[in-house]
């Protein structure tokens, strides 16, 4: 399951993300953050960290540097 999610994120990064251009207000981007958190923390914790990060991605959050912990 973990490898499938990482593959799906990779497909998104390769084929869909270039169509919208650089729109993420964070570094690393939310999709890169999700891949790194899944690889570092495993499925459940990685999904949790990814969901929290995506919920912070809105116009009222300043964004900036937010590495995977």
UniProtKB/Swiss-Prot annotation:
Alphabetically list the UniProt keywords: Cell inner membrane, Cell membrane, Membrane
Q: What is its main location?
A: membrane
The region annotated as signal peptide is none
Q: Does the keyword field hold 4Fe-4S?
A: no
Tell me the compartments it is located in.
Answer: Cell inner membrane
* Pfam families, A to Z: YidD
The membrane-topology field of this record reads:
Peripheral membrane protein
Looking at the UniProt record for this protein, which Gene Ontology cellular component terms does it annotate, in alphabetical order? plasma membrane
Is Cell membrane among the key words of this record? yes
The record ties this protein, via HAMAP family, to: UPF0161_YidD
Q: What does this protein do?
A: Could be involved in insertion of integral membrane proteins into the membrane.
Entry's family note? Belongs to the UPF0161 family.
Q: What is this protein called?
A: Putative membrane protein insertion efficiency factor
């Amino acid at each position: 399951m973990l490898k499938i999610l990482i593959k799906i994120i990779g497909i998104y990064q390769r084929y869909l993300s270039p169509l919208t251009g650089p729109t993420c207000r964070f570094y690393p981007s939310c999709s890169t953050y999700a891949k790194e958190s899944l690889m570092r923390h495993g499925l459940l914790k990685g999904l949790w960290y990814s969901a929290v990060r995506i919920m912070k991605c809105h116009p009222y959050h300043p964004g900036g540097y937010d590495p995977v912990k």
